[in-house]
Amino acid sequence: MRSSLVLFFVSAWTALASPIRREVSQDLFNQFNLFAQYSAAAYCGKNNDAPAGTNITCTGNACPEVEKADATFLYSFEDSGVGDVTGFLALDNTNKLIVLSFRGSRSIENWIGNLNFDLKEINDICSGCRGHDGFTSSWRSVADTLRQKVEDAVREHPDYRVVFTGHSLGGALATVAGADLRGNGYDIDVFSYGAPRVGNRAFAEFLTVQTGGTLYRITHTNDIVPRLPPREFGYSHSSPEYWIKSGTLVPVTRNDIVKIEGIDATGGNNQPNIPDIPAHLWYFGLIGTCL
C-alpha cells in the first residue's frame, strides 16, 4: 500500500513538472505547411511591391500551395515605418482566407548582432504587459494602415478566416499585431515560425489565454532565434509550442511535430544544447531564401 502511494505521488509530481506533449492532427499539419509557405512568400522581393489583384508567386518552389490556391494580393508594403516592416495582405478564395504575412530579417546574423533587449509597457494590449521595444514600435508604425486594410478585406469577405503569419522577425510582428487587433474585436489566428520571444511573462500569459483566435507558435529543433531575447532579460514564451523535432533539410511529417504545453516549457526548442542558425531556415522546407 505504501509503495503504491509513493508511486502515485511520484507520478503526479512528474506530470506537474514535465510539459504536456501531444501530437498534431493531419488538418493542423496541413495548415502549418500552408502558412509556412505564405511566410516564405514574403521574402520574395517582387511580392512586396506587387499590384493588387495579381497572383502570388515564388521562386525556388517556395510556395506551391499558395500558388495552387491562386491567392492574390490585396496590398503589399516594403520598408515601411520603423524597422522597415515588409510583407503583404493576401486574398485566398480557394481556402477562404485573408492572410497578412510579414517578412523576416534578410540577414539572421546581423539581426542577432543588433538585437536589443529593451522592454516597454504595452498596457493598451494587456495590463502589466511589456513587449520588446523594437517589435512593438515596428508594429505601431504601420498599425493604422494595416488595420484599415484588414478591416476593408473583412468587410468585403465577412465569412473568410483572418490569419497573420511570419517567420523570424515576421513571426514576432504577426504575434504582436494579432494580439493588438484581437483587442479591437477581430478574430485572428496567428502562425509564427522560428519567432523570438516578444515580451515579459505577463504578455506570454496573456497570449496563451487571449480569446478571438489562436496563436500557433512553431519552432524547430535547436533554432537559435526562439531562444532570444534571453529569459534572463525578463522575456517569456507563450504556450503551447509546436516543436519540429526532425533535422534540417529532412522532410517534415505530422509525427515529427510535438505540441508542448506550458509557459517557458522545456523539452522542445528550450533545451540546454548548442543553438543552430541553419535550423532557423528549415520550416516545412527552406524558408527565408526566396529573392
Swiss-Prot record:
EC number: 3.1.1.3
PANTHER family assigned to the protein according to its UniProt record, in alphabetical order: FUNGAL LIPASE-LIKE DOMAIN-CONTAINING PROTEIN-RELATED, TRIACYLGLYCEROL LIPASE, PUTATIVE (AFU_ORTHOLOGUE AFUA_6G06510)-RELATED
Keyword NAD: no
One GO BP: lipid catabolic process
Reactions mediated catalytically: a triacylglycerol + H2O = a diacylglycerol + a fatty acid + H(+)
This protein's UniProt keywords: Cleavage on pair of basic residues, Disulfide bond, Hydrolase, Lipid degradation, Lipid metabolism, Signal, Zymogen
Record keyword Protein transport present: no
Gene Ontology terms, MF aspect: triacylglycerol lipase activity
Protein name (Swiss-Prot/TrEMBL): Lipase
UniProt-listed Gene3D superfamilies: alpha/beta hydrolase
Disulphide bridges: 44-290, 58-63, 126-129
Propeptide feature ranges: 18-22
Catalytic residues (UniProt): 168, 223, 280
Biotechnology: Used as a detergent lipase. Sold under the name Lipolase by Novozymes. Engineered variants are sold under the names Lipolase Ultra and LipoPrime.
pH-related activity note: Active at alkaline pHs (up to pH 12 approximately).
Signal peptide per UniProt: 1-17
Protein's gene: LIP
Activity under varying temperature: Active over a broad temperature range.
Top EC class, one word: hydrolase
Impact upon substituting residue 168 to A: Decrease in liposome binding
